[in-house]
Amino acid sequence: MRRLIGVVVLAGVALAGAGWLLTAPKPLPEGSLDGATGDAERGQLVFTAAGCASCHHAPDAEGEARLVLSGGQRFASAFGTFLAPNISPDPAQGIGDWSLDDFASAVKRGVSPEGQHLYPAFPYTAYARMEDGDLVDLWAYMQTLPASDTPSQPHEVGFPFNIRRGVGAWKMLYASPDWVMTEAESPQLERGRYLVEALAHCGECHTPRDALGGLDRSAWLTGAPNPNGRGTIPGLTPDKLSWGADEIAYYLSSGFTPEYDSAGGHMVEVVENFAALPDEDRAAVAAYIKALPEGGHLD
C-alpha cells in the first residue's frame, strides 16, 4: 500500500511539474527583431487600425488628450474587471523602459518584461498575427507620444482568475496565430482579413465566447453578449447583416447605418479609427465581411 501511495504521489508531482512547464510564459526569442528600424509615420496607421488609444487613453479623454496613453478605462467581464494600464513612454509608470523585444513579446505573446502572463483582455491573440514590420513601425510611433506619470491600477480579478499561471493553460487552448478565414483569394480580401482578424481584432467583440472566455471560432463574427451585461454586440455574417459592401465601408467612415441609425458605445471610437484609414482599407474590410459564410463556419 505504501508503495502504491508513493507511486501516486510521484505521478502527481510529475504531472504538476509538467503542467508548470507547459504553462510557462513563452516570450519571443531575444534579439528576434535586432536591426529592425521602424517608420513612425507608418506606425501611426498601425496604431490607429489597432485601436491602441481607444482602450488606453484616460477615461473621458477627448481630442489630442486621447494620445496620452495613461490608462484607467475599466472593462467588465465574467472573470472580473480589467483596467487598461499606462502604456505611454514614461519610464517609471509606462513602458518607456521597455525594449523592442519586450514590446513584441507583450503584443504577440501576451508576456510582460517581468515574465508574467498578461490577461487576454489585451487582444494579443489577435495581434499574434501582426506582421513584424507593422509591429516595429508601431513601436517607433509610440515613442513619439506624450508620457504620463499616472500609475497603472490593479485589475479587479478574484480567485482563481488572479492566478496568472492559469492564463498559460488558457493560451494552450485558445492562443493560435492561424487565420480563421484560411483562404483569401485576392489581395483585397487578404488585406481585409489582416485588418479584421489581426489589427482591428474585430472578433474580440463580435464573436461569442465559451465558458472559459475563449472565442468560438466555429461561430466567427456571429455576434455576442456585451461583456458589461448590457445588450448584445451584433453579428456581421450574412444571416445577421444584410448591408452591401459600399454600405459597410460608408458606415466605417461615417458611423451612419443604412437604417438611419448611428454607431454607439465603443463602436464610436472604432469608426473614428477606421475613418482615419485609407479608403482601400475600409473597402477591404467590407469585402472580408461580405465573404463570410452564414453562421460563421469558416473552419
Regions flagged by a language model, labelled:
Residues G6-W20, T125, M130-R193, P208, ...:
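Extended surface/linker regions that mediate inter-domain or inter-protein docking
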Residues P27-E30, E41-Q44, H57, E64-Q93, ...:
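Sequence context of c-type cytochrome heme-c attachment sites
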Residues G72-D102, T125-L135, W220-E259, V270-A283:
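Electron-transfer interface patches adjacent to heme c in soluble/periplasmic c-type cytochromes
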